[in-house]
């Protein structure tokens, strides 16, 4: 805007009025003559806005023509039509919530090109003591102000101190103070000479004199004048005085301005200082309340330009407004002194504009400020743009309240317009703007005429910051304008490209100033001032000051009368807005937008109309702050909707500057935020009709005629991002506490928060601060807003309100942004690739070593197994498991412990899954292949880290995992077989042992589970793993682990679990061990489930645990279940080892009894849902169940093994195990039952096979095995994966009473993975009660869960509801679980195709033995009752739809004869056949089936819990009917041979899960479908199909059963126990996961989702902050694949929803690689390693590492390494990994010692050398406490092991002597020469290895030995003793005694004191 020089009075008036209510006279732009400047006139007119339509400065000979409020004209017959519809041209919504953009203002370089008075900030020191250095001098000067540069001059020839120095202060005040206080003072004995040396001329003169030798530093002639006072040009002094006034006004507050080098000098200096307003970013500029005086504003002292540049538009406004305010006071004199200074003041007024608006704030010189209202164009205006424009809008009064905001806006504007000199209007504007000290309420803009001088004075006083040039008259400013504009434009261009923040501030200023340039056209005086003098500083120079020069700015929030108006032809307001320096409309709009935004915010902050001056001061400082505060404040501020709308429109239009030619059009401004009235979309601003704004501000990319929006001031919208960053950081820092967030994260979160607030329609960035205010939460907040506010270049067509925020929203981005981004992307990608490569390499190495060790261990174990299958296998398995556990533990430890589980720890985007996955690069997945080999199973497990196993096993669990699980289970079985040697005396003991083996198995299982779980949720998997590992290590550990992972759940559940555990303990030690696992799992599980599980646990603790675990994580559950099942099996097997036959008999009896009772009680219980106390049924049934379970465990295991045998790897292992497990499977008490299941699995699951060995039908000792399966299934199942038998027993809901007559082939009853509660619900309790009870009891128990145990566990989840309760009573399923009853008619599934072998004892399914899960035919064994019963999770009705759940999808090759609902497990055998027939079990098998049915109940209940989790897995195995297994006996043999491998068990579990899933309507179907893959892939005999779906039960079961048959029952029991324990561990882990997932599972189970969704853990609802923290943590830690996956899923789901999320429609999902790369980089950073500029240390070359940094990472690394072992020890999991490593190392060392003992000493050394070379010790060098660097062990080293070879150059003595001298000359004090013998010396000085770092110690832990290898002598360092991790490697140098002693620093007790 151009203004005639307004009279100071006018100006003061106008700005204040402008700042106040623009209803006051906003006549600053009017000539005094045209409109009286009197307040009366103001009152009469109540103009809210004005526009300078004609500016004589632009049109010669014409009078200034102002249009007020779009209707009135300053001249009666203007000939210009009034505006049709008067409204605020500014798009207010854009500015509603402006956040301060902290745009670092580039510092103006004071050089020959500098235009205007140079700010006297440079001080020259002379006669300094030559000891004074930069630091000293800088410290000496800092007390007087911020020091930007300190330079001491030296003689270039001799580098001697010349005694002269240059100190550049950030502020003139600081420089003056320094001169004042330091001149002629004594410093270091010298009286120093200090003077202001603005251009350094004096210093250069001194320098020349000194360098030329004319004087010495002490004789240097320093003029008295120099001494007396710093030489400052008058102009600089004037500027300085002006500055001082500014500074004094601002001075009190420490602001970047004062501290900033240019703060006082000019807007440029402060804004250009590059120091963003300290307060500008998001903090209010006032650094406190938005109303804080500008003094507090960072740039308040500086000019608005600086503030503006530093800050977003508001910042400008704030600083300018603030400063000008203060400056108004101080500069009033200066300004009055020089009319030209009006312009300068206008610049200041830019800030002054804020002051003007601050007129709202109490300010003595609001009148002066009003001059700045013209500045309203400038940043001040911008800031107040909203309300001013709103004021301009038809809302005079309404806007008045807003106008206080406008006042702020005016301040901003004022800042620009204040250069009234520049504007011909300035005078008028000032007069008009002369807002009378109505400071807070310049309701009516004074007529343009009013005190323009005053206003100018105000502007000037405001501008004094810019008044670096204050002395320069406006003309001078004009003269400087071109050069300054050009220069500023160049600077701004640079800044645009370089600093978005700067651009933001500059943009406002530049825009204003650039607009000012046109405005300066309007007022040539102002115009000359560089448009970029955004701040008041360069008022003369800056167009911005020109805008500020007008009272106009103050008068009108949108300085209509700006030069823009003049630029524009009179005819059209729009065209005027466009053409005239868009600044007036646009600038006004923009500035108004800014001002309004800032004002809104300020007002909101300060109150609608705090005294304008105060408010403006505060407002501007708070402009950014206000913008931020205004987020909250905007709503509070009484902005009338009309105002808001108008403001929005005007602001938006203003905000949406027309992109300058050559710049891409600005994107449309973001829609106004909801909640704020949006002004009607302003018609798109017509292109600037005339670049009347003849002076296109060079910085302004916008067309010269179109002044860019203030906010748009800089073409680079990017500025807003930086501003956002700063603001976001500030805001977030405030809001989010100390949470470390990356800028992006802060920005995103702040944006989200802002969006959520939606308090103001104006975008923050539009406001010139952050774009977080974007209207739409998901709208890119920064781009358009940045563009709008940050880019001056897209000037709005004057104030075409039509320009919507969208255009404003997206401003031109930095032209180099794409390039920079591309380069950054490339670099980031490369760095990530490098990091990934390094990580992968490291991981591969680690994995390779580990795999090798494991392979070695496995081989050893296999060898030992062949010798001593039980012991060696066990120990090795344990070792492997431990190793794996360690790995997993270490991986999981931090996460599971909950230490790293926080958002920070996990990285929010990464999650536990990501965390675990990262360490375990799938490289470790060698198990599946190994799993294929029975012998390799162990190896497989070790080879896979738990994480890897979990990750991939879970993924591949159905198929590859099945094999691996089988192999794991085989290994476990081997361990279990070995385990029998150990009595399961104590729960912990057994569990620990089982856990050891199961640990491996669990690892495998976990790996498979985890893979699945990763799909479901790696968190659960992790917790499962952790729990699993904990279980392995011990129940206590497991409890700890789980408790850490799920302490809450444990707390609530522990009691239940404890009771369960106690009852379980009573029942059996195995139960106890299971109990502990279960306890943990239970704790993890929901209490309700826990209670059910407790009851179940009382009967079947393991099953309960499994069920719970399944509930948490079906994948992990499956693994755990396998482990748990193995453990139970082992326990059961081992406990009743002796009485296997008896147990079998008992089992048969129990089966019959249970079948009967189960049928009755199950119905009863299902009705009751846990009516029957579990304890009773458990206690009574436990023994029976144990027997049954063992009986069934063997058959089931056999079946499972057969199924697994079908799987390649499991078969082999099983076969290996077969011999071991040939022993009869002893029935295990309740706890043993699950274990028995595995043995059962060992035996063929065929009806006869399952009970082939056992013989007797499974019978529960208690006639009634009453287990409330449904409830347990629902709760416990979800929470606890159940052991097949235990689940059955545990399911109180379905009291499983095995009727003596009832026989169920173990395979008949698939251990269905139960949907957490879905399946349970599926089967009506009534229906389930009778048939399902028997079925469940028999099926679950009969069905061995080891392979099928997963099924059992899953089935138990399902099983509770599925088997007896939940499972629809398929004819066979509902039928009492007689042998046939066990046909796994998916009990949960109504008429599930697979029914238990035969619901009635008499029915036999063609005698085909079946795998517990697979054997189940989908066709109802008996259509009678079970077939009809759909399995519904409690409350769910069976629906065919449910089948969409994968397991239920389709019973493979199973006819869904039962109900339309496919049975959970498709059976190969005909669906309808006797259960025996289906399972192919003889009577014995049926009996076993009964036991498995019993187990199956548990499993079902477990499965019910896991239903969702495992549905898919289970359905895979279950749904696929397995081909008939070999006869029961054969399978028994096989199973005996081979204990259920983890995979088998997992497969069974999966199968069970599938069954359970199938049973659940949809969930069952879906899970069945999922599970079916195994079955489908190879449907084997039901027996052949392992219940464990992880392993392809098909092959593995087939193979395993024979193996199992061969395996002694003891081994089977051991295996089973191991499996059970493993499952238990898994269960625990799953439980912990399930506790989280169970709730979701329950939900899912209850409402099976059409699509199978992984179980979700239930967490306490996160706060919005937490959500956002997680959401935006991707900015900190990147986003991992998992998060991307889920984000994509969420995106897809959201797209399918009609939530009005329009942004989604505009969002296109584009694949992007994960950005979450866990790399050592962070650790290194943490360790103190510096960040490399290039991003890669390798590219940095050699550089010196600071000792401090070294100490940091030395200490940190050492402490970390030391702590890690401690943590590891403290945590069983970590300890185990270490132990496993240690164990391997010890074994190796033992082997070496053995070998060495066999061979001679020489050979021994050589052997040790080779072996150690083969197995390199992990060492590292770090700072040593002994001397400099030292070598430290990173792993425990056993005594007499080779640590490292001393490597170096092999040289002769002569060379060594020469080198020693040379080294001494070179300053290499350390000696790295090691004498090998008399002739040879190894010199490691220049080349060598880490051995060179080994320090001497008088009490060393190593010794050096010379050995000969291949005729070469080598120095090898051997360990003398056991060396712990992080212990320094030392040896005795054994230097010869010499006269010159070398002190010894070893610090040993027996230290000799010297090395020699």
Curated annotation (Swiss-Prot):
Biased composition, class Pro residues, residue ranges: 363-373
Compositionally biased spans, kind Basic and acidic residues: 1-20, 594-605, 1001-1011, 1341-1352, 1541-1551
RRM domain segment(s): 111-199
Polar residues: compositionally biased ranges: 254-290, 298-312, 346-361, 375-407, 416-432, 451-464, 535-551, 575-593, 1358-1367, 1450-1462, 1769-1783
Biased composition (Basic residues): 1628-1638
Known catalytic reactions: L-lysyl(4)-[histone H3] + 3 S-adenosyl-L-methionine = N(6),N(6),N(6)-trimethyl-L-lysyl(4)-[histone H3] + 3 S-adenosyl-L-homocysteine + 3 H(+)
EC class: transferase
One Gene Ontology MF term: histone H3K4 trimethyltransferase activity
Stretches assigned to the SET domain: 1817-1934
Binding-site list for S-adenosyl-L-methionine: 1933
SMART domains: N-SET, PostSET, RRM, SET
Residues covered by region (Disordered): 1-46, 226-478, 502-637, 662-696, 926-1148, 1341-1386, 1420-1464, 1512-1553, 1627-1655, 1766-1790
Keywords from the named record: Activator, Chromatin regulator, Chromosome, Methyltransferase, Nucleus, RNA-binding, S-adenosyl-L-methionine, Transcription, Transcription regulation, Transferase
Main location: nucleus
Comp. bias regions, Low complexity: 517-527
EC assignment: 2.1.1.354
PANTHER family tied to this protein: HISTONE-LYSINE N-METHYLTRANSFERASE SETD1 (PTHR45814), HISTONE-LYSINE N-METHYLTRANSFERASE SETD1B (PTHR45814:SF1)
Role played: Histone methyltransferase that specifically methylates 'Lys-4' of histone H3, when part of the SET1 histone methyltransferase (HMT) complex, but not if the neighboring 'Lys-9' residue is already methylated. H3 'Lys-4' methylation represents a specific tag for epigenetic transcriptional activation.
Subunit comment: Component of the SET1B/COMPASS complex.
Protein name per its UniProtKB record: Histone-lysine N-methyltransferase SETD1B
Source organism (scientific name): Xenopus tropicalis
Top-level taxonomy: Eukaryota, Metazoa, Chordata, Craniata, Vertebrata
UniProt gene name: setd1b
């Amino acid at each position: 805007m151009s203004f005639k020089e307004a009279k100071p009075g006018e100006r003061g008036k106008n700005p204040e009025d402008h700042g106040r209510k623009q209803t006051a006279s906003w006549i600053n732009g009017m000539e005094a003559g045209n409109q009286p400047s009197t307040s009366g006139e103001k009152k009469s007119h109540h103009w809210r806005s004005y526009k300078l339509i004609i500016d004589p400065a632009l049109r010669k000979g014409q009078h200034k023509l102002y249009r007020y409020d779009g209707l009135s004209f300053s001249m009666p017959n203007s000939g210009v039509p009034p505006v049709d519809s008067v409204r605020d041209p500014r798009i207010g919504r854009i500015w509603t919530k402006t956040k301060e953009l902290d745009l670092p203002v580039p510092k103006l370089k004071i050089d020959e090109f500098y235009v205007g008075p140079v700010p006297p900030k440079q001080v020259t020191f002379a006669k300094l003591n030559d000891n004074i250095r930069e630091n000293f001098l800088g410290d000496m000067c800092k007390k007087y102000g911020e020091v930007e540069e300190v330079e001491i001059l030296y003689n270039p020839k001799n580098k001697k101190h010349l005694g002269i120095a240059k100190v550049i202060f950030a502020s003139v005040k600081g420089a003056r103070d320094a001169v004042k206080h330091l001149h002629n003072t004594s410093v270091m004995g010298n009286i120093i000479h200090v003077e202001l040396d603005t251009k350094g001329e004096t210093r250069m003169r001194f320098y020349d004199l000194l360098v030329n030798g004319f004087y010495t530093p002490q004789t240097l002639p320093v003029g008295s004048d120099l001494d007396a006072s710093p030489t400052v040009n008058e102009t600089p002094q004037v500027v300085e005085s002006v500055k001082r006034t500014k500074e004094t006004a601002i001075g009190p507050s420490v602001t970047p301005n004062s501290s900033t080098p240019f703060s006082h000098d000019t807007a440029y200096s402060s804004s250009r200082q590059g120091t963003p307003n300290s307060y500008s970013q998001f903090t209010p500029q006032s650094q406190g309340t938005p109303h804080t005086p500008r003094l507090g504003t960072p740039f308040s002292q500086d000019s608005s330009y600086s503030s503006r540049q530093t800050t977003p538009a508001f910042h400008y406004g704030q600083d300018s407004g603030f400063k000008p305010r203060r400056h108004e006071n101080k500069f009033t004199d200066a300004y009055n002194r020089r009319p030209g200074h009006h312009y300068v003041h206008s610049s200041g007024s830019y800030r002054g504009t804020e002051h003007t608006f601050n007129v709202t704030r109490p300010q003595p010189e609001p009148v002066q400020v009003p001059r700045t209202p013209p500045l309203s164009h400038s940043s001040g205006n911008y800031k107040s743009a909203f309300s001013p424009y709103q004021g301009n809008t038809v809302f005079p009064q309404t806007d008045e309240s807003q106008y206080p905001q406008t006042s702020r806006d005016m301040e901003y504007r004022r800042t620009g317009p204040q250069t009234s000199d520049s504007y011909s209007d300035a005078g008028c504007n000032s007069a008009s703007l002369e807002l009378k000290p109505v400071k807070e309420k310049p309701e009516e803009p004074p007529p343009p005429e009013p005190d323009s001088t005053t206003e100018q004075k105000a502007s000037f006083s405001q501008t004094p910051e810019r008044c670096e040039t204050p002395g320069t008259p406006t003309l001078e400013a004009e003269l400087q304008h071109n050069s300054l504009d050009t220069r500023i434009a160049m600077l701004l261009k640079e800044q645009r490209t370089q600093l978005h923040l700067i651009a933001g501030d500059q943009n406002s200023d530049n825009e204003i100033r650039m607009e000012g340039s046109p405005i300066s056209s309007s007022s040539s005086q102002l115009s000359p001032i560089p448009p970029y003098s955004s701040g008041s500083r360069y008022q003369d120079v800056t167009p911005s000051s020109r805008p500020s020069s007008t009272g106009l700015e103050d008068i009108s929030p949108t300085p209509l009368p700006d030069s823009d108006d003049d630029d524009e032809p009179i005819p059209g307001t729009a065209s005027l807005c466009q053409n005239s320096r868009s600044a007036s409309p646009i600038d006004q709009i923009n500035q108004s937008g800014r001002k309004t935004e800032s004002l809104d915010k300020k007002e909101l902050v300060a109150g609608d109309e705090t005294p304008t001056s105060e408010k403006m001061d505060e407002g501007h400082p708070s402009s950014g702050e206000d913008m931020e505060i205004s987020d909250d404040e905007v709503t509070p501020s009484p902005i009338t909707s009309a105002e808001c709308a108008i403001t929005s429109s005007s602001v938006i239009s203003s905000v949406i500057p027309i992109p300058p030619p050559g710049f891409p059009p600005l994107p449309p401004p973001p829609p106004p935020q909801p909640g704020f009235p949006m002004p009607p979309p302003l018609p798109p601003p017509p292109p600037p009709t005339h670049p009347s704004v003849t002076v296109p501000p060079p910085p302004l990319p916008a067309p010269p005629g179109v002044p860019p929006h203030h906010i748009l001031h800089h073409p680079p919208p990017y500025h807003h991002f930086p501003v956002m960053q700063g603001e976001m950081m500030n805001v977030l820092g405030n809001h989010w506490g100390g949470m470390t967030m990356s800028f992006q994260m802060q920005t995103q979160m702040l944006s989200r928060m802002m969006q959520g607030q939606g308090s103001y329609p104006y975008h923050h960035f539009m406001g010139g601060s952050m774009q977080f205010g974007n209207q739409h939460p998901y709208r890119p907040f920064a781009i358009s807003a940045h563009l709008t506010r940050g880019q001056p270049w897209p000037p709005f067509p004057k104030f075409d309100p039509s320009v919507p925020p969208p255009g404003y929203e997206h401003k031109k981005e930095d032209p180099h942004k794409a390039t920079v981004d591309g380069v950054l992307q490339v670099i980031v990608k490369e760095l990530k690739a490098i990091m990934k490569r390094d990580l992968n390499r490291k991981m591969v190495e680690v994995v390779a070593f580990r795999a090798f060790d494991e392979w070695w261990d496995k081989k050893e174990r296999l060898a030992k197994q062949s010798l001593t299958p039980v012991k060696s296998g066990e120990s090795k398995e344990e070792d492997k498991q431990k190793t794996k556990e360690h790995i997993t533990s270490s991986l999981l430890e931090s996460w599971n412990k909950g230490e790293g589980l926080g958002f920070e720890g996990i990285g929010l985007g990464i999650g536990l899954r990501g965390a675990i996955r990262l360490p375990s690069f799938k490289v470790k997945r060698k198990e599946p292949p190994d799993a294929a080999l029975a012998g390799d199973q162990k190896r497989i497990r070790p080879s896979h880290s738990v994480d890897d196993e979990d990750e991939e096993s879970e993924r591949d669990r159905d198929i590859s995992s099945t094999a691996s699980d089988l192999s794991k289970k085989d290994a476990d079985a081997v361990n279990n077989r070995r385990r029998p040697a150990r009595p399961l005396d104590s729960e912990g003991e057994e569990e620990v042992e089982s856990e050891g083996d199961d640990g491996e198995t669990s690892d495998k299982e976990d790996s498979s589970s985890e893979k699945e779980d990763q799909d479901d949720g790696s968190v659960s998997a992790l917790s499962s793993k952790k729990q699993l590992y904990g279980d392995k290590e011990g129940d206590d550990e497991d409890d700890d682990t789980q408790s850490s992972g799920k302490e809450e759940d444990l707390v609530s559940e522990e009691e239940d679990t404890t009771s369960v555990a106690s009852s379980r303990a009573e029942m059996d030690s195995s139960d106890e061990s299971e109990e502990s696992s279960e306890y943990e799992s239970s704790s993890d599980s929901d209490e309700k489930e826990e209670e059910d599980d407790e009851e179940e646990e009382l009967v079947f603790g393991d099953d309960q645990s499994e069920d719970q675990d399944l509930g948490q994580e079906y994948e992990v559950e499956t693994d755990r279940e396998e482990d748990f099942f193995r453990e139970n099996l082992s326990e059961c097997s081992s406990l009743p080892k002796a009485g296997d036959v008896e147990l079998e008999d008992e089992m048969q009896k129990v089966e019959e009894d249970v079948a009967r009772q189960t049928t009755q009680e199950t119905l009863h219980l299902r009705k009751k849902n846990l009516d029957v106390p579990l304890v009773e049924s458990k206690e009574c049934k436990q023994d029976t169940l144990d027997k049954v379970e063992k009986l069934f465990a063997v058959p089931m295991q056999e079946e499972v093994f057969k199924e697994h045998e079908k799987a390649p790897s499991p078969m082999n292992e099983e076969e290996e195990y077969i011999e071991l497990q040939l022993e009869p499977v002893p029935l295990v008490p309740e706890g043993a039952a699950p274990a028995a299941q595995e043995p059962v699995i060992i035996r063929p699951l065929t009806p006869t096979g399952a009970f082939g060995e056992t013989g007797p039908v499974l019978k529960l000792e208690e006639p009634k095995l009453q287990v409330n399966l449904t409830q347990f299934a629902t709760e416990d199942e979800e929470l606890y994966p159940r052991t097949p038998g235990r689940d059955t027993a545990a399911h109180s809901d379905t009291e499983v009473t095995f009727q003596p007559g009832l026989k169920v082939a173990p395979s008949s009853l698939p251990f269905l993975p139960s949907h957490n509660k879905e399946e349970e619900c599926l089967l009506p309790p009534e229906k389930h009660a009778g048939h399902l009870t028997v079925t469940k009891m028999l099926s679950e128990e009969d069905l061995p869960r080891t392979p099928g145990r997963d099924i059992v566990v899953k089935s138990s989840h399902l099983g509770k509801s599925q088997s007896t309760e939940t499972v629809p009573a398929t004819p066979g399923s509902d039928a009492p679980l007689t042998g046939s009853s066990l046909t796994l008619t998916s009990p949960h599934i109504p008429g599930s195709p697979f029914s238990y072998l035969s619901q009635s004892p008499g029915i036999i399914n063609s005698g085909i033995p079946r795998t517990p899960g697979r054997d189940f035919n989908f066709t109802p064994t008996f259509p009678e009752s079970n077939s009809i019963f759909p399995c519904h999770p409690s409350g769910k009705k069976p629906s065919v739809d449910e089948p969409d759940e994968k397991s239920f999808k389709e019973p493979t090759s199973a006819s869904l004869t039962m109900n339309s609902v496919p049975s959970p497990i498709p059976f190969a055998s005909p669906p309808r056949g006797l259960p025996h027939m289906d399972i192919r079990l003889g009577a014995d098998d049926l009996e076993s089936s009964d036991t498995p049915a019993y187990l199956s109940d548990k499993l079902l209940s477990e499965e019910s819990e896991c239903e969702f989790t495992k549905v898919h897995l289970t359905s895979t195995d279950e749904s696929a009917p397995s081909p008939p297994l070999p006869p029961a006996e054969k399978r028994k043999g096989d199973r005996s041979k081979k204990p259920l491998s983890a995979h088998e068990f997992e497969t069974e579990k999966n199968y069970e899960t599938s069954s359970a899933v199938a049973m659940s309507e949809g969930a069952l179907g879906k899970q069945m479908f999922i599970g079916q893959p195994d079955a489908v892939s190879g449907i084997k005999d039901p027996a052949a199909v392992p219940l464990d779906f992880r392993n392809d039960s098909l092959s593995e079961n087939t193979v395993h059963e024979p193996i199992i048959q061969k395996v002694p029952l003891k081994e089977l029991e051991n295996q089973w126990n191991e499996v059970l324990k493993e499952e238990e561990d898994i269960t625990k882990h799953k439980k912990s996961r399930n506790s989280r997932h169970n709730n979701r599972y329950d939900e899912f189970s209850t409402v099976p989702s059409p699509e199978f969704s992984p179980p979700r853990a239930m967490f306490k609802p996160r706060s919005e902050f937490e959500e956002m923290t997680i959401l935006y943590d991707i900015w900190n830690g990147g986003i991992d694949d998992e998060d991307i996956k889920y984000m994509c899923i969420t995106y897809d789901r959201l797209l399918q929803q009609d939530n009005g999320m329009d942004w989604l429609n505009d969002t296109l999902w584009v694949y992007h690689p994960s950005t979450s790369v866990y790399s050592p980089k962070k650790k290194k950073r943490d360790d103190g390693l510096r960040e490399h500029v290039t991003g890669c240390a390798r590219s940095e070359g050699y550089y010196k590492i600071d000792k401090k940094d070294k100490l940091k990472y030395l200490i940190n690394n050492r402490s970390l390494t030391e702590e890690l072992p401690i943590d590891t020890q403290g945590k069983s999991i970590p300890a185990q990994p270490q132990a496993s490593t240690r164990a391997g190392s010890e074994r190796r060392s033992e082997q070496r010692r053995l070998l060495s003992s066999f061979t001679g000493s020489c050979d021994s050394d050589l052997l040790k050398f080779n072996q150690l070379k083969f197995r390199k010790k992990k060492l590292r060098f770090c700072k040593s406490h002994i001397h400099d660097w030292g070598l430290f062990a990173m792993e425990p080293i056993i005594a007499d092991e080779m640590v490292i070879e001393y490597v170096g150059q092999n040289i002769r003595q002569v060379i060594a002597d020469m080198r020693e001298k040379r080294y001494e000359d070179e300053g290499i004090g350390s000696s790295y020469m090691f004498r090998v013998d008399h002739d040879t010396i190894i010199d490691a000085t220049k080349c060598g290895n880490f051995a060179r770092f080994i320090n001497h110690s008088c009490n060393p832990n190593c010794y050096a030995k010379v050995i000969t290898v291949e005729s070469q002598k080598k120095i090898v360092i051997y360990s003398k003793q056991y060396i712990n991790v992080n212990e320094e490697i030392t040896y005795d140098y054994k230097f010869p005694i010499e006269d010159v002693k070398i002190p010894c620093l070893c610090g040993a007790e027996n230290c000799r004191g010297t090395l020699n």
